[in-house]
Structure formats: C-alpha cells, structure tokens
C-alpha cells in the first residue's frame, strides 16, 4: 500500500475517532446537565423534608425542655420545702407546753366523763353490782390513759402526726422518682433523635456543598465541550487538508520539459546534491514536501485526538463526581425514611407525656399538701403563742368579773340589811297597830339576791380545733368548711 492510501486510512481512522469522541462528549455533558437538574429538584425536596423534620424536632425539644423545667422546679421546691418543714418541726420541738393548761383540760374531760358515768348508773335501776364495778374499772383505765397521754405531751411537736407527714413526703418522692425516670427515658429519645437530625443535616450540607461545586465546575465543563467542538473542527480541517495533499500526490503529473544537453561528467560530479532543475526533480521535491506536510498534519490531528480523549475523560470524571452525589442523596433519603422509627419515638414520647402529666399532677398535689402542712405548722406555733395570751386575758377577765360580782354581792347584802331595818322601823312605827288580816305579809322577810358562779358545759360549737392537728388535717378542715351547716 502506497503512502497516500496509508494516509487516507489514517485520516478515516482519525475522523471516526473524532466523531466518536465528540459524540461521547456531547452525550456525557447532556447526562451531566440532566443530572444537575435532577439534583436541584432532589435537593429542594430534601430541604423541604428537613424543614418539616426540624419543626417537628423543635416541638419535641420544647416538650422535653418543659419536662426538664417542671422536674427541676419540683426538685428545687422539694429541697427548700423539706428543709423548711424540718426547721419548723425543730421549732415545735423546742416549744414546751404549759402543763397547767394540758392537765387542766384533761382533768375537766375526766370529770365530765365521770359525771356522765355516774348519771348513767343512777338512772339504771336494773344495773347490777358487776356493771358498776366494770364502769369503775373503765374510769380507772381512762384515767390512766389520760395520765399517760399527758406525760407524753411535752412540746408542740408531740401533737404533730409524723406518720401522715412521712406518708405524704414518701408519696411525693415516689411521684418525683417517677418523673425522673420519665425524664431519663425521654432524654435517651431526645439524644438519639437530635444525633440523627444532626447527622442528616450534616449530610445535607455535604450534598449542597458538592452540588454547588458541580455548579461552579459546570461552566468549565461547558468550555471543555466548546473546546471539543473546536478541536473536532480543527481535526476535520486537517484531515481534509491531508486528503487534498494525498490527491495531489496521487494525481499530480509533471509537465514535459524541452530537450537540454546532457550534463558533462565533470559537472555532474562536481554537484554535491541534486537540485530541482529538471521537471522530474521538481516533481519529486513537491511530492516529498507534500508527504512531509501530510505527516505533520496527521501528527497534529493525532495530538488533537489525544487532547479530545483527555477532555472526554475529564468530562466523564466530572459526570462521575456528580453521580457520586446521588450516593449521598441515597444515604440521606434512606436516613429520612426512618420515619417509622421517628413515629415510634414520637408515640413513645406521647405516652411518656401522658404519664408525666399524671405524675406531675400527683406531685403538685402532694407538694401542695406539704405546703399546707408547713403553713399549718406556722399557724399552730403562732396560735399556741396567742393561746397563752388568751389564757392570760381570760384570767384577767375572770378576776375583773369576780371583783365586780363580789362588789355587787356586798352591795346586795348591804341593801338587804337596809331593807330589813326599814321594815322593822315601819313595823315598830305603824305595822304593829294594823290588823294581820289587813296586811298578812307585813312580817315577811325581804327577798334576798346574790351573785354566784355558774359552771356548766360550753354550748359553743367550735368546728375547728387548732390544737388537734391529728384529727383535723387541712384537707378535712377545707371539706368541713365547704359543707353547709345542719338545719337547727
């Protein structure tokens, strides 16, 4: 095969390669462009889902923070309240009772009980001696119990029902422990959910970063495609030029030249190189020149083809990088599809919320009871101090009224004696001269009056006894106050 045929074969091969490379470049760039468009839509949709997820997570976090705030508030109140109650109880322990008040009150109760028992025995005509002995024994037992109770009552603290107080405290601590357990379980859900959300957010940011990088590089890729088109045109022009040169070599024939004398041997030997002086030599020179041009063109076209191949690889690599974003998108979408897990966590959290509200209501109720007890302990202490003042006031009032009564008794006695003297004087002066039938009561004694102390059971019904805290809790007192009074 001659030079022209080989060159044309190379031209054909180069042309096919350039066609294929340009086609691949255009197809790859089109795929790349479509990929970026799809990525734009996918990223926008992912952003919407992440916004919804973030809003839901915000609600979740708000509720969790409410849990923590409520629990922390109760814990702080517990510490201060328990300390306050302990301090108040210590004050009550140091507040010693006036034994005169306690023993006097119980002795009066014993006397009333004995009087009631005696009245019952007197009214029972059919009661036997054994019954009387049993009543006497009961009176002795009651008396001993009262004495024992009096011996146990030394301070105001002895009136406090510690068992009920400890029961309320333990119930409050139980509710608080339940709240703490719910907070711990909610914290685990809160932590795992936030970690998952943070991971998805970081993945989305990475996708956005890669996408923005592809957008920036898309301009260079467009320039690369333009370069491919220009290289394609250059190679085609070079191949056309090669084909033209090959046609020249194939079809070119030198024109006949006039006869010339043959060169002398001396002249031929003296020439060092052939010169294109003859037509044949000129023809050979042109042919060689064309061959050199063809080789240069083929070499240049091959270099351009290699450059096109390199550009194709760059375009394909860029497309592969864009496709790698789909792997990140797939992973994020798979993570977002954990909606079932999130729904289960949300349902679990809703159940925790219901339990938390119930326990919170119970804890608030018991802490309210403890606050009420603390307030009543203050009122008890204050009331006892006022009770001592009231006893002094009553004693003073009793002495005042006693003084008035004694003075009035003296005045009544004086008036009575004065009345007797007046009647005797009237009788001596006039009465003895009158017939008895006319004034039969003339010798009667005057009616006497005197003031005496009357001791009877109190008719005042106190619906609230501030000293009997064991039998009158703040709750019972409130219920009693809310009940309507009985019809008289």
Curated annotation (Swiss-Prot):
Keyword terms, alphabetized? Autophagy, Cytoplasm, Membrane
Query: Where are the residues of the annotated region Disordered?
Result: 103-150, 257-284
Tell me the InterPro entries matching this sequence.
Answer: Atg17 (IPR007240), ATG17-like_dom (IPR045326)
Q: What GO molecular function annotations does the UniProt record carry, in alphabetical order? A: molecular adaptor activity; protein kinase activator activity
What is the recorded membrane topology of this protein?
Answer: Peripheral membrane protein
Q: Name one GO biological process term.
A: autophagosome assembly
Please give one Pfam family short name. Answer: ATG17_like
Location of this chain's protein in the cell:
Cytoplasm; Preautophagosomal structure membrane
Q: Which domain of life is it from?
A: Eukaryota
* Cellular compartments per GO CC: Atg1/ULK1 kinase complex; nucleus; phagophore assembly site; phagophore assembly site membrane
Record's compositionally biased regions (Low complexity): 105-126, 134-150, 265-279
The keyword Methyltransferase is annotated on this UniProt entry = no
Functional description taken from the UniProt entry: Autophagy-specific protein that functions in response to autophagy-inducing signals as a scaffold to recruit other ATG proteins to organize pre-autophagosomal structure (PAS) formation. Modulates the timing and magnitude of the autophagy response, such as the size of the sequestering vesicles. Plays particularly a role in pexophagy and nucleophagy.
Query: Per the similarity annotation, which family is this?
Result: Belongs to the ATG17 family.
What is this protein identified as? Probable autophagy-related protein 17
């Amino acid at each position: 095969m001659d030079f022209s045929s080989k060159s044309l074969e190379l031209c054909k091969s180069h042309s096919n390669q350039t066609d294929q490379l340009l086609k691949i470049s255009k197809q790859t760039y089109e795929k790349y462009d479509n990929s970026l468009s799809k990525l734009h839509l996918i990223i926008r949709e992912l952003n919407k889902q992440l916004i919804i997820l973030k809003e839901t997570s915000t609600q979740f976090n708000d509720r969790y923070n409410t849990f923590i705030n409520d629990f922390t508030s109760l814990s702080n109140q517990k510490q201060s309240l328990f300390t306050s109650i302990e301090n108040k109880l210590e004050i009550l322990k140091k507040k010693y009772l006036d034994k005169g008040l306690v023993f006097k009150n119980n002795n009066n109760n014993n006397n009333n009980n004995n009087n009631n028992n005696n009245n019952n025995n007197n009214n029972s005509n059919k009661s036997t001696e054994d019954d009387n002995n049993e009543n006497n024994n009961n009176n002795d037992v009651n008396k001993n119990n009262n004495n024992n109770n009096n011996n146990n009552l030394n301070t105001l603290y002895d009136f406090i029902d510690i068992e009920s107080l400890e029961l309320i405290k333990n119930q409050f601590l139980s509710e608080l422990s339940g709240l703490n357990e719910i907070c711990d379980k909610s914290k685990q859900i809160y932590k795992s959910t936030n970690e998952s959300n943070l991971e998805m957010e970081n993945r989305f940011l990475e996708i956005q970063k890669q996408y923005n990088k592809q957008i920036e590089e898309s301009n260079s890729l467009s320039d690369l495609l333009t370069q491919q088109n220009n290289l394609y045109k250059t190679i085609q022009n070079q191949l056309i030029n090669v084909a033209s040169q090959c046609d020249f070599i194939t079809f070119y024939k030198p024109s006949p030249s006039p006869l010339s004398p043959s060169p002398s041997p001396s002249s031929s030997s003296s020439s060092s190189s052939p010169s294109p002086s003859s037509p044949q030599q000129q023809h050979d020179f042109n042919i060689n020149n064309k061959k050199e041009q063809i080789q240069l063109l083929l070499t240049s076209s091959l270099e351009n083809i290699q450059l096109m191949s390199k550009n194709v690889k760059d375009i394909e690599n860029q497309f592969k990088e864009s496709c790698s974003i789909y792997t990140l998108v797939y992973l994020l979408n798979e993570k977002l599809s954990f909606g079932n897990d999130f729904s289960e966590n949300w349902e679990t959290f809703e159940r925790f919320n219901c339990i938390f509200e119930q326990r919170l209501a119970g804890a608030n109720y018991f802490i309210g009871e403890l606050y009420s007890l603390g307030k009543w302990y203050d009122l008890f202490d204050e009331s006892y101090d006022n009770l001592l003042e009231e006893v002094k006031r009553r004693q003073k009032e009793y002495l005042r009224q006693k003084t008035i009564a004694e003075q009035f008794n003296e005045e009544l006695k004086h008036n009575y004696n004065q009345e007797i003297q007046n009647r005797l004087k009237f009788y001596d002066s006039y009465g003895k001269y009158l017939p008895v039938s006319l004034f039969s009561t003339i010798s009667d004694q005057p009616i006497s009056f005197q003031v005496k102390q009357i001791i009877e059971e109190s008719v005042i019904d106190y619906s609230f006894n501030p000293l009997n805290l064991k039998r009158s809790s703040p709750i019972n007192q409130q219920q009693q106050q809310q009940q309507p009074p009985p019809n008289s």
